[in-house]
Amino acid sequence: VTKDGILELEQRRFKAMCDGDADALGALLHNDLTYTHSSGAVDSKESYTRGVREKLWDYQSIKASDATVSVHGGAAVVHCRLRIDVKVGGVPKIVESVALAVWVDDGGWTCIAVHSTPAPK
C-alpha cells in the first residue's frame, strides 16, 4: 500500500464516522481495535461502533492537517492534527487533537489502534 492509499483509508474512516455509518466504519476497523479518545476513555471495536451507531458521538465534521504517514511492511502509522466538530451525548463540542492511527494488513488493511490527545495550545 502507498502513503496516499493509507490517507484515503483515513478519509473513508472519517466519512463513515461523520455519516454515522457504523457498518462502513466497522469494515475499516480491526477486530482487535483499541481506540483511545482525547479524554483518555478507551473503546474496543464493538463499543466504539455501537457508540457511533447510537449517536453517543455524533460527528459533524473531521478536518485533518499536518498528516505524516510511514509504511513498514504490513503496518502503517498516521500522525496528524484533527479538528473535530462532534456532539457528545447531544452536547456540541469542538475537539482539537493530535492523533496517531495504526493500520495493519491482516488480509486487508484495517485500523487496529487510534490514540488521540488534546492538541497543544
Predicted regions and their residues:
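A beta-strand edge to alpha-helix "cap/lid" segment located at domain peripheries
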Residues: V1-A27, D32-K121
